């Protein structure tokens, strides 16, 4: 059950992002310009 590193793909497991002592990375989804399906990557939370 390895966690998903920052900026890595979490499309198939939205709750897999790694957590540190301070915060948990958030699986953030977007649609690349030519893509038919969304792409999700683990990102640092925006409010920090």
Swiss-Prot record:
Gene Ontology cellular component annotations, sorted alphabetically: extracellular region
Annotated PROSITE patterns: SPIDER_CSTX
Keywords: Disulfide bond, Knottin, Secreted, Toxin
UniProt tissue specificity: Expressed by the venom gland.
Record carries keyword Ribosomal protein: no
Gene Ontology MF terms in the entry: toxin activity
Annotated S-S bridges: 3-18, 10-27, 17-42, 29-40
Location in or out of the cell: Secreted
Assembly: Heterodimer of A and B chains; disulfide-linked.
Family affiliation: Belongs to the neurotoxin 19 (CSTX) family. 12 subfamily.
Protein name per the record: Toxin CSTX-15
Species annotation: Cupiennius salei (American wandering spider)
């Amino acid at each position: 059950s390895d966690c998903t590193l920052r900026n890595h793909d979490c499309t198939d497991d939205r709750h897999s992002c790694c957590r540190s002592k301070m915060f948990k990375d958030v699986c953030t989804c977007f649609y690349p310009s030519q893509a038919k399906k969304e792409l999700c990557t683990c990102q640092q939370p925006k409010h920090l």
